[in-house]
Amino acid sequence: MTAGETRVAPPRQGPSPWSVRATLSTTVAVLGVAALLHFVRYTLLIVNRSVLLNPIVAGAATWLAVLASVAALFSVIGCAYVLTDWLIARRAAAFEHRHQPDPRPGWALRAGCLVPIVNLAWAPVFVLELALAEDRPARLRREIWTWWGLFIASTAVSVFATATSFTTDAQGIADNTVSFIVAYLLAMATVVAAAQLVFAVERAPVERPAHRWVVVAEEPAPQHEPEQKPEKAPETPAEVEREGQEPAA
């Protein structure tokens, strides 16, 4: 590269920051709506024990909850794909900045992030490796552990809610509805924690990693000695007498 040339940064790969934010916000909204509709359904189930509900109202509440569950499922899957693409692109940029290739191939990253149950162990490992590559494990520790804990809890409750969704008695349906409410709330909290983790990582660009500033004592200013005026030569008495002349009386 010659002196007159400027280095052009490589184009950003993976999803844009705007698309990541939009996906996370949409997923949180869909999960919140799903939790709300299941809460409405649970309320109607309680009311139906003492008051006979209109079949149209009962059917609408049931099908709206089902549609919300389907929308939440697709939203979570789409969010997982976008976050996986973001992680792969961020890791590639971080290791390229260190002049090293990513030690894990793309297929391994996708499998570890997208395969259910497997991603509980491997997805956080991939994020920890990213934090180490950017020399920021301590700064991101709280966000990583918060997201990881919520991820495990959300998966466990979701599996339990799905496994108990085939019950047919009234009490079992009510209990399963509560399980889904908790599952959606935990999933929403997990996505919020993932968003906070992404924002924390994006806060420091790869091209400008975080620095640790060290306070250095300021050197004392040099003291200038006052300028000394040159000594004035002693004045000699004016010559009033000339040779060959007597002094005046």
Model-derived features: positions:
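Hydrophobic, aromatic-rich membrane-embedded alpha-helical segments
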Residues: 105-127
